[in-house]
Amino acid sequence: MALATFKATSKLVKGLQVDTHVRNFTVRMDEPPSLGGTDTGMNPVEALLAALGSCQAIVAGAFAKSQGIDLQDFWLDVEGDLDPDGFLKGAPGVRMGFQEVRITPHIKTSSSAEDVAKFIKFVESRCPVGD
């Protein structure tokens, strides 16, 4: 299969508010007041966590049946730790991005614990956002 190209256009609107256009969708991003924004949308690092969780949830939904998993309910808690001083202050030696990302999957199924563990590994391995 040929490479697929995805495109997003992000425009600074006002202050720290950014509207990102993808296909027929617009997503507003902003920062919370504690980081200088007006809290009109999630911030980019929250969007990154949301994208990772959404990607894994989509993989789970797309492949559960073919992997023999009776998927009755599925969600993920995704958390990431970063030091804002990297972005806000340009502090030397402070990593800009996440120092750690934790994903906790929750699954309701009649499948065995062993099959669920294999399925979760499969989901993690097939998510392009987490690659």
PLM segments and residue spans:
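Extended beta-strand/beta-hairpin segments
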Residues: 1-50, 61-131
